[in-house]
Amino acid sequence: MEKPEFYFSHVGINEGSPKETEEMVKFCRLLFGAGDIQESAHAYFAGDRTMEIQKGGGRGRNGHVAFYTPDLKAAMAYLEECGYELDASSAKYEEDGTMRLIYLKDEINGFAVHLTTRK
């Protein structure tokens, strides 16, 4: 099977406590500028969205690493062929029903790993 395209998307940092999250966001504002911090219901994003600071924890002992792929089905098949099991229960879908995200079943070096179709 031909290897599909994979690109680094972002690293997710799990919240230790609300105070620690606040300190990380403050530090990122210092480095990247206040305008580069976006907030969502579950996380803050910094560094051109390459850093995700989770609110209330997240997957992975140390956090997570995300990889963008333009062809999620091919990427999933490729990883499964290479011996990596996917966690079907972790799949997230767009409103039109197409899958946009899925995690590997097992962590790698303490990090959860997910594939995403969003840059």
Annotated model-derived regions:
Residues 58-59, 72-74:
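Short, charged/polar surface micro-motifs in flexible loops or helix N-caps
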Residues 8, 60-64:
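Eukaryotic phosphotyrosine signaling hubs
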Residues 100-112:
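Short, low-order "capping/linker" segments at domain edges
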Residues 1-51, 74-81, 89-100:
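Core segments of cupin and vicinal oxygen chelate
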Residues 55:
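Conserved donor-binding loop and adjoining core beta-sheet/short helix segment
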Residues 14, 66-70:
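Short hydrophobic/aromatic beta-strand micro-patches
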Residues 115-119:
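Short beta->alpha transition motifs characteristic of CBS
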